Curated annotation (Swiss-Prot):
This is Putative snRNP Sm-like protein. Belongs to the snRNP Sm proteins family. It comes from Methanococcoides burtonii (strain DSM 6242 / NBRC 107633 / OCM 468 / ACE-M). The lineage of its organism: Archaea, Methanobacteriati, Methanobacteriota, Stenosarchaea group, Methanomicrobia. The keyword Metal-binding does not apply. PROSITE patterns: SM.
Length: 72
C-alpha cells in the first residue's frame, strides 16, 4: 500500500469503496477508475443515507471537487 492518496486509490481499484461527498451525500460502489483531479468512476453504485440504500444507480462518474473522502 502506498502513502499518497492516489496510491491508495490505485490499491482500491476494482474493490468496493464508500465515497462521501459535500452535502453529506454518500455512495458505495466498485471503483473502476480515477484521475489526478480525483474524479471517480464507480460501477454498481448505490446512494446511501444513514448506511441504508436509498437508490441503486449503476455506473456513475463523481466529480473530484465534490469528494470529501474515499474509504476503501
Amino acid at each position: 500500500m502506498g502513502n499518497r492518496p492516489l496510491d491508495i486509490l490505485n490499491d482500491a481499484l476494482n474493490t468496493s469503496v464508500i465515497v462521501r461527498l459535500k452535502g453529506a451525500r454518500e455512495f458505495r460502489g466498485v471503483l473502476q477508475g480515477y484521475d489526478v483531479h480525483m474524479n471517480l468512476v464507480l460501477d454498481e453504485a448505490e446512494e446511501l443515507k444513514d448506511g441504508e440504500i436509498v437508490r441503486k444507480i449503476g455506473g456513475v462518474v463523481i466529480r473530484g471537487d465534490n469528494v470529501v473522502y474515499v474509504s476503501p
